[in-house]
Swiss-Prot record:
Region (Involved in interaction with OGT): 456-756
Full protein name: Trafficking kinesin-binding protein milt
Gene Ontology terms for molecular function: myosin binding; protein-macromolecule adaptor activity
Residue spans of biased composition, Basic residues class: 1033-1043
GO BP, sorted A to Z: axonal transport of mitochondrion; establishment of mitochondrion localization; mitochondrion distribution; Nebenkern assembly; oocyte dorsal/ventral axis specification; protein targeting; sperm mitochondrion organization; vesicle transport along microtubule
Start-end of Low complexity biased regions: 750-760, 854-871, 956-983, 1007-1022
Record-listed Phosphoserine modification sites: 831, 918
Region (Disordered): 1-31, 536-561, 750-775, 805-830, 852-871, 955-1101
Basic and acidic residues biased stretches: 9-26
Coiled-coil parts of chain: 142-209, 235-382
């Protein structure tokens, strides 16, 4: 069996009908009808008709409703055809006999009878089949009728029908294949039959011709044997036919065997083909699955290829950009290298010049010191004459001077006249009327009790003809008239806050000096020296000169009535001072004059027997001016109704541009005040702001919870000063809380009111109000002194960095980025510490709160029972609070070893130590004088002790600290206590505050011990509850600042320095900053004093950031200290 295409099957379906028709025609032509062929042809026709009818019925869909019926009929017809088509041997022999009989004997009638029998058999079979189909159809209809009522049975039947249908389709396909094969075989056999029939006809014809020939031959040869010839021919023909039949039988058998063998081979081939088809289908399925997988992989590879292409394009663009930037940066690097080379060359040249200038500066400074020493000696020699009689000396020497010493039209005469005898100025202003000034001077000279001196002599010798000088020749009057229109115009409120929370402001009107006129010149100076005009420049403020800081006078020898003066001062009350000021402010013009005594008819004889020019501490002219009365029996601190600023400096043309440039240069100069103050619009290159450093700004105008804001002198700024003298006034806590604004004119009042909201308010140092008594507690401070004058007045010794030597070694560089130090190079020279004065001030403030002075101790002893009930609250002034905050910052600096950055030089210590204090600061609690031999070694800070004292609420300090502090407090002006703060421990880095532990020198040990033993036992007691409250408030404020600022990290622009616990991080351009365990020089003495506290301190990031700012101040490009 072979597989054929369905198309070929459909094409060959109609071929058997045509072939059968042709066979019938051929058989009809020959006149022979075979039994097998007739029945087969009829069955073929019937099957063909049945197939055509079935196909027609299937197409129309009228009779057959199921494909199963069609398949059943087709199978039945094809099975019948297959059975009837089989040819047996008997049939073949019968056909041969019929053919042989027809050839020999003609047409035989048996063929007709055989065909009738076959047709009857076929009709009976068809009737049986039709009957069977009717029975099956009836059974099927009955089954379908019963099954329609059961849905499950219908479902099962449908499933069975589906399975039967599939089986029927498969069987139909196989049958169609077999039918096609059989049809092909039938066609071949018919062809063979035709050929055999032709051969047989040809043979019959030949046989007939031969028989005729034989008969002719026989007839011609043997005429007499006519009776025997037919018999012989018959016998010959029979033998031939018999042999032919035998051969055909043998051939038939061989063909059957061959057909059987071919059928077996065909089955084997078909089985092999089925196996091949199964294998091919399996391989095709595998190939399809592999194709799908490869398609997915190919899609994924395409997506990856697309992404890689995009990345390649992006990277190519970036590479091109990077190459361009590399080229640009290479060019910039070359330019920067060339600029760096040039900068290094300039830096080296500038360093050499700086070293040369430093050497010259040292020489000049040495000459200045020698000149100052000589000047001091000269003043001491002339001191007794100034004490005995100030103007009397003038009178005695007046005859010798004649009229040539002071020309009447000279500027010197006008300056002397305005500074000594002005009636309309605060300290040394210009008089309003020259003629009235001359008259007043003559009246004063007449009242002076100098025996041989007269007004005519004084007027003729010293100020001869002063009143006769024409007005147009007087310089001050001309300048006054020229500058009267713009005298009080506001030229910009420029404030610069100096260290210590004292403010300076440039105000309207003439500029006043930032430094007070030396008060000692009125006590010690001679007649010619004290009358001279002294001008202090900015260079003299930076020098270590005693000219601006005169020594404290030991009493007033030669001045009669000193004891009475002291008694009068003790009896003076704040109410009287306020009343006197009010009278002087609002009295009519001419009411109070210098030529009229104060106490005519009133019996007021206080302040009598004082020399002319001697000032009292409570006088309004105590620090900057000298008021003189009309006689030696009366001393007046009053002035006339109107206080006006001096107008001396109007001889200089005002230059606003110069003032602006001076202000800019002052802002650009880095100072430590920049760390504590916020200056809007001004930044330090490489520095960081207060927020980055973890600090907050507290101004003097901030109202804190335990400080009242009703203190006097805080609402208005004092008049600004430039280059000459200083206005000053005494502010005492017991003077009440009334704002005295009488010293301001109307225009100044309006300008001050307008600038109050934008400028910082200077404040006088407020002390705790222990009582209304002012015994031994009066100290005079200037309101608007400069930084140097303020520090000197408070007993603080400070040296400006410009006056100190800077290292000039090979590894020193003055620029902002010095050269790197080579390996093995010696360490750079150390500079003196600029924070020495501030530390001493802070130590004084702590000492005031812990120990207290003798007067407060006496009051606490008297009111010990009352203090237990009332719990008096401790008050800190703004200056003290500012100093404590400054000390906290300084403590962070010294915890990482500030002494290694700017350490004190032994050679310059003597200059700082030999500087004397102001006479105004001798009675204050801050007068801790430094000695020349113990500036570094006599004092250090013991944080452990002070921390314990602060935690105990300032109740009971340790015995050593208490005794030393008590001794220092009781030492007074006569005892010199060593309190230098240039060396202190940095092992403990806590932020609770600084504690000063005084190490008394050997020479001062007996004195301090005796003083400490003389103090009462209750001298160091204080209010514990208030102290603890204050301590907790300070700690809370500190913790809030730390949390808010987040402990700022290191400065990336200034590099990193070694902390207290680390090592190895070195900035080569700033030198090495050693930690607490690596400093050898300073740790030697500390290890002797504190051997148990030599452990490493933890690093602090705030400290590192602060040191970064300090380094920018020290090594900054624009005016750094070093």
């Amino acid at each position: 069996m072979t597989h054929v295409n369905n198309g070929e099957v459909m094409e060959k379906e109609m071929e058997p009908t045509g072939e059968r028709e042709r066979d019938r025609e051929t058989a009809a032509g020959s006149g022979v009808h075979h039994r097998f062929l007739a029945s087969a042809s009829e069955r073929d026709a019937n099957s063909g008709n049945a197939l055509e009818a079935a196909a027609t019925k299937t197409k129309t869909g009228t009779t057959i409703t199921n494909l199963e019926d069609l398949a059943f009929e087709a199978c039945q017809n094809w099975s019948d055809l297959h059975q009837d088509f089989f040819i047996t041997d008997d049939e073949l022999e019968y056909e041969d006999e019929l053919s042989l009989g027809s050839s020999i004997g003609g047409n035989i009638a048996t063929t007709t009878t055989a065909d009738a029998a076959v047709e009857g058999l076929i009709t009976g079979e068809h009737q049986n089949e039709q009957l069977l189909m009717e029975v099956l159809c009836g059974n099927r209809v009955s089954q379908m009728t019963r099954a329609y009522d059961d849905i499950e049975a219908v479902t099962r039947l449908l499933e069975e029908k589906e399975k039967d249908l599939e089986l029927t389709v498969q069987i139909g396909k196989e049958l169609l294949t077999q039918n096609n094969a059989l049809e092909a075989r039938v066609a071949d056999l018919e062809t063979d039959l035709k050929a055999s029939n032709d051969d047989r006809a040809q043979l019959v014809h030949e046989l007939h011709k031969k028989n005729e020939l034989i008969s002719v031959l026989t007839n011609d040869a043997d005429d007499g044997t006519d009776t025997d010839t037919p018999t012989m021919s018959k016998s010959i023909t029979l033998d031939l036919l018999q042999r032919k039949v035998n051969s055909l039988l043998d051939e038939n058998k061989s063909l059957k065997c061959e057909a059987t063998q071919l059928a077996h081979q065909t089955d084997e081939v078909e089985e092999h083909e089925r196996q091949l088809m199964a294998d091919i289908s399996a391989q095709l399925n595998d190939a399809n699955s592999q194709y799908d997988n490869l398609s997915l992989e190919l899609e994924r590879q395409r997506e990856e290829n697309r992404l890689q292409h995009e990345q390649i394009v992006n990277l190519t663009a970036r590479l091109a950009e990077a190459e361009m930037r590399l080229h640009q940066l290479t060019q910039d690097n070359d330019e920067h290298l060339s600029l760096l080379h040039v900068t290094k060359e300039n830096q080296n040249a500038l360093a050499l010049e700086l070293v040369e200038f430093k050497q010259r500066y040292e020489e000049v400074l040495a000459l200045l010191h020698s000149a100052q020493d000589q000047l001091k000696q000269q003043r001491k020699r002339s001191q007794p004459q100034a004490r005995s009689s100030f103007l009397g000396g003038l009178g005695t020497s007046g005859a010798g001077m004649g009229g040539s010493l002071f020309p009447p039209d000279s500027l010197h005469c006008e300056l002397m006249e305005s500074s000594l005898y002005s009636e309309n100025s605060l300290d040394s202003g210009i008089s309003g009327d020259s003629q009235r000034s001359a008259d007043r001077i003559s009246r004063m000279m007449m009242h002076m009790p100098s025996g041989g001196m007269s007004s005519s002599t004084m007027g003729g010798s010293v100020y001869a003809g002063a009143g006769n000088v024409p007005p147009y020749k007087r310089v001050f009057d001309t300048v006054r008239c020229a500058g009267k229109s713009g005298n009080y115009m506001d030229s910009g409120n420029v404030s610069m806050t100096q260290l210590g929370a004292m403010s300076m402001s440039s105000s309207s009107g003439p500029r006043m000096a930032s430094m007070a006129y030396p008060a000692g010149s009125y006590y010690r100076g001679g007649s010619n020296q004290s009358l001279g005009v002294k001008t202090l420049s900015s260079e003299s403020l930076n020098s270590q000169s005693d000219d601006g800081y005169p020594a404290q006078p030991s009493g007033v020898p030669g001045a009669p009535g000193a004891k009475e003066l002291e008694a009068a001062l003790k009896r003076l009350t704040p109410a009287e001072v306020l009343a006197r000021r009010a009278m002087l402010s609002y009295a009519p013009a001419g009411t109070y004059n210098y030529d009229e005594p104060m106490g005519h008819g009133t019996g007021n004889v206080r302040n009598s027997d004082l020399p002319l020019g001697v000032r009292t501490p409570d006088s309004i002219m105590s620090t900057g001016s000298s008021g003189m009365s009309g006689s030696t029996n009366h001393m007046s601190a009053s002035m006339t109704h109107q206080w006006r600023l001096p107008e001396k400096l109007q001889i200089i043309k005002p230059m606003e541009g110069s003032q602006t440039l001076h202000h800019w240069s002052r802002l650009a100069t880095p100072t430590l005040s920049g760390l504590l103050d916020e200056r809007p619009g001004v930044t330090i290159r490489g520095g960081r702001g207060l927020d980055d450093l973890g600090m907050q700004i507290y101004t003097l105008s901030d109202v804190e919870e335990d400080v009242s804001d009703d203190l006097p002198g805080k609402q208005f700024e004092a008049p600004g000063c430039t280059f000459t003298y200083t206005n000053s006034m005494v502010m005492h806590p017991d003077d009440g809380f009334v704002n005295d604004l009488s010293f301001l004119s109307q225009s100044q009042m309006s300008s001050r009111m307008a600038s109050t909201s934008t400028s910082r308010q200077p404040s006088c140092p407020a002390t705790p109000r222990a009582g209304l008594s002012r015994k031994n507690s009066c100290s005079t401070f200037s309101v608007n002194l400069g930084l140097a004058g303020m520090l000197n007045e408070r007993g603080i010794k400070a040296v400006t960095p410009s006056a100190l030597n800077t290292p000039a070694g090979p590894n020193f560089s003055p620029t902002v980025t010095p050269c790197n130090s080579p390996e093995g190079s010696p360490p750079r020279a150390q500079s003196p510490e600029p924070l020495f004065g501030l530390l001493s001030c802070g130590a004084d403030l702590i000492r005031r709160k812990i120990v207290g002075d003798q007067h407060q101790q006496q009051q606490q002893k008297q009111r010990s029972s009352l203090s237990k009930q009332q719990q008096q609250k401790i008050m800190l002034s703004h200056l003290e609070r500012r100093a404590l905050r400054s000390l906290n910052l300084i403590e962070k600096v010294e915890s990482i070893g500030l002494e290694n950055i700017i350490s004190a030089q032994r050679g310059l210590g003597s200059g700082i130590a030999n500087r004397s204090s102001s006479p105004l600061s001798s009675g204050s609690l801050q007068s801790l004088h430094t000695s020349s031999n113990s500036i570094v070694d006599d004092i250090h800070f013991d944080r452990a002790q002070i921390k314990g004292v602060l935690h105990r609420g300032l109740k009971s300090p340790t015995p050593a600290t208490a005794s030393t502090s008590a001794a220092a407090a009781a030492s007074g002006p006569g005892i010199s206590t060593s309190s230098s703060t240039s060396a202190y421990n940095s092992d403990d880095s806590d932020d609770q505050g600084l504690v000063m532990k005084i190490k008394p020198s050997k020479s001062a040990t007996p004195t301090t011990t005796g003083a400490a033993q003389s103090q009462p036992s209750s001298a160091t007691t204080s209010n514990g509850t208030a102290s603890e409250t204050r301590l907790k408030q300070m700690q809370r404020q500190k913790s809030r600042r730390q949390l808010k600022n987040g402990m700022a990290n290191q400065r990336p622009d200034l590099g990193t320095i070694s902390g207290a616990g680390g090592g190895g991080r070195v900035r080569p351009d700033l030198g090495k900053v050693a930690d607490s365990g690596s400093s050898s020089k300073l740790s030697t003495k500390r290890s002797e004093a504190k051997p148990a506290e030599e452990e490493e301190a933890t690093p602090q990031t705030i400290t590192q950031a602060f040191v970064g700012s300090v380094s920018s101040l020290l090594f900054g490009r624009k005016g750094g200290w070093l």
